[in-house]
A protein has these predicted regions:
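Conserved N-terminal Rossmann-fold NAD(P)-binding element of oxidoreductases
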Residues: 4-8
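Hydrophobic/small residue at the entry helix of a nucleotide-binding pocket
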Residues: 12
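Aromatic pocket-lining residues of Rossmann-like dinucleotide-binding sites
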Residues: 20, 89
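NAD(P)-binding Rossmann-fold cofactor-contacting core
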Residues: 27-39
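N-terminal Rossmann-like NAD(P) cofactor-binding module of classical short-chain dehydrogenase/reductase
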Residues: 71-76, 96-98
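Beta-loop-alpha module in the N-terminal Rossmann-like domain of NAD(P)-dependent dehydrogenases
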Residues: 73-88, 103-105
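Rossmann-fold NAD(P)-binding glycine/threonine-rich loop
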Residues: 99-120
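C-terminal catalytic/substrate-binding lobe primarily of soluble NAD(P)-dependent oxidoreductases
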Residues: 141-360
Length: 360
């Protein structure tokens, strides 16, 4: 049994915390609104007051002098709040998994982490996360790539009218995703393009036409995979992003209203779909597709994101030396670890089609 501290128990965080508790681990949950895990056996709740630092609360509530153990910290607080926690954790000799997906990536704390003996694995969701792992496998097989593309989205299973969308994560983070310029690779160099550009129609099996547009999701891949052209596109039902653009350009976009209008509704069927493609210079091409419609244990995007993180946690607990001190992106994980993560997700009912899905 390990002692694991979960910062943030929202849709994704609660999934991870519950899975860890069900596996017999001692889980400490830190959140200002921990309602999703109240009453769950094996989870001790630490209520965060507004503005409180979860790292300080963790050390205060479980002092080291009293035999306090930190086997692993899982930071699932969103955006800048989560980034501040990971930066603080980089100054302590603990293992951390970072799922904050902040604009300010934790690789900037690599030197600090090495100095203090901290090991941080970041962005281990579905995309970024599993997408990085798959592209790293393509790079290991092909060498430098000619082209790489990721298309991913969590959406209602069919158009619902209006926005045709509900946010599986914080709507504020989705708005940030739609406004932050997209960093991509063109002619082997990093360039910045306007968010939501390169809008195009794609066909998603069993769903029909959907719309893809550039977003800033490559992150660590910008510096880790040698490639001529690389892009990440978010996928939505047609009309959704044009409605956002029209309201934004006309000055009537109200972020407070969006948070209400995009609120997740557990009664609405939804699915997550991802396609990862890599092309070699000799013409070889590999494609993976990932699809999930959720299950009794959670909605699809939260489940997929949480499953990748959960699998990484299990791997790291079984091999404490899996990663040395420093800050590590998901593509730095060994092939055998990636293979086991894929198989664990398959065992959980996530559909993954492509190479490495039957390796032991």
């Amino acid at each position: 049994m390990a002692v694991i501290h979960c910062f943030g128990v929202g849709l994704v965080g609660s999934y991870v915390a519950k899975r860890l508790a069900q596996a017999g681990h001692e889980v400490h949950a830190y959140d200002p609104k921990p309602h999703r895990v109240i009453g769950i056996q094996g989870i001790e709740i630490h209520l965060l007051e507004p503005g409180e630092d979860p790292v300080e609360v963790m050390v205060r509530d479980c002092p080291v002098d009293d035999g306090f153990a930190i086997d692993l910290v899982v930071n699932m607080l969103p955006g800048s709040i989560g980034h501040a926690s990971t930066t603080a954790l980089a100054a302590s000799p603990w293992r951390t998994i970072d799922l904050s997906f902040s604009e300010f990536t934790p690789d900037r704390d690599d030197e600090k982490a090495r100095e203090h003996g901290a090991s941080i694995l970041w962005d281990v969701g579905i995309a970024p996360g599993l997408s990085n792992m798959l592209l790293s496998e393509a790079y290991r097989d092909f060498g430098s790539l000619k082209k790489a593309e990721v298309r991913v989205g969590g959406n209602p299973t069919e158009p619902t009218g209006g926005w045709n969308y509900m946010a599986p994560f914080s709507p504020i983070d989705v708005i940030a995703e739609y406004t932050r310029p997209a960093r991509v690779i063109r002619d082997s160099a990093e360039v910045t393009l306007p968010a939501l550009s390169e809008k195009h129609i794609i066909e998603v099996p069993e769903k029909g036409d959907m719309e893809a547009f550039l977003t800033d999701g490559l992150r660590s891949l910008l510096n880790s995979i040698p490639v001529i052209e690389m892009s990440e596109y978010t996928v939505r039902w047609p009309g959704h992003i044009q409605m956002f653009i029209d309201k934004r350009d006309s000055g009537v976009l109200d972020e407070v209203d969006l948070q209400s209008q995009w609120q997740y509704d557990s009664k609405t069927p939804e699915f997550t779909w991802m396609e990862v493609m890599a092309e070699a210079f000799d013409g070889r091409r590999v494609t993976w597709t990932v699809q999930d419609h959720g299950s009794d244990d959670g909605h699809s995007m939260g489940r997929c994101t949480g499953l990748v993180a959960y699998c990484c946690i299990i791997e790291w607990l079984e091999d404490p030396d899996m990663l040395p001190p420093g800050v590590h992106a998901p593509e730095s994980l060994p092939s055998e670890v990636i293979s086991r993560i894929i198989n664990m997700m398959l065992d959980e009912g996530v559909e993954i089609i492509g190479p490495m899905t039957s390796h032991s």
